[in-house]
């Protein structure tokens, strides 16, 4: 019994430390993936707002192809006037332009660009970036489906790595204790 307690005392701090490190690695990679999901939309929203501020027409900054956001990972753009009314959109949800949260537009009106995870319905999650322009707002977005698949893979790999490290450290400690007992005997 004393040997088991000794093994637990040696292994438990290692188990806790490795759990913390695996969690830190997972969170770092997950956040990197999620923040990277905004990169194309930042450029799209900023470029469209610049063009609109320079006098371009609303239709010229919105892609002609419609994107059914429930089924596609393609990026899309929605342009709103200053009251939040949709002026043009390349996004549809079941054939209609989805409603975007007015609170986000209010925030952007006061603070500037915002990056928001938007879920217009269950199972449809979008990485969106909203940029103000002189007469309203430009929102660029795309599906998080692929990013979330990668996050799940990283979560699984982190869990497997943690279990492997726990098993390896436990085996080393047990073997070390057994060898030490034989030498003492």
Q: Which sequence ranges carry the predicted segments?
A:
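Short, well-ordered helical secondary-structure segments
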Residues: 14-16, 20, 28, 64-67, ...
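Extracytoplasmic ligand-binding sensor domains of the Cache superfamily
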Residues: 42, 46, 51, 61-123
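Alpha-helical transmembrane segments of membrane proteins, especially the N-terminal anchoring helices
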Residues: 1-40, 131-185
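Broad hydrophobic/π-residue packing in well-ordered secondary structure
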Residues: 7-10, 26, 75-77, 88-89, ...
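Extracytoplasmic
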Residues: 93-159
């Amino acid at each position: 019994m004393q040997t088991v307690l000794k093994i637990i005392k040696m292994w438990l701090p290692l188990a806790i430390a490795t759990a913390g490190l695996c969690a830190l690695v997972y969170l770092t990679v997950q956040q990197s993936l999620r923040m990277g999901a905004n990169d194309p939309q930042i450029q799209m929203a900023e470029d469209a707002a610049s063009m609109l501020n320079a006098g371009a027409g609303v239709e010229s900054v919105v892609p002609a192809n419609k994107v059914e956001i429930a089924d596609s990972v393609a990026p899309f753009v929605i342009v709103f006037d200053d009251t939040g009314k949709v002026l043009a959109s390349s996004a549809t949800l079941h054939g209609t332009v989805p409603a975007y949260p007015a609170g986000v537009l209010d925030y952007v009106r006061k603070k500037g660009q915002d990056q928001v995870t938007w879920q217009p319905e269950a199972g449809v999650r979008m990485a969106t970036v909203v940029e103000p322009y002189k007469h309203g707002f430009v929102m660029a977005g795309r599906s998080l489906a692929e990013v979330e698949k990668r996050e799940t893979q990283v979560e699984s790999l982190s869990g497997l790595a943690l279990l492997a490290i726990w098993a390896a450290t436990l085996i080393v400690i047990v073997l070390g204790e057994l060898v030490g007992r034989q030498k003492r005997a």
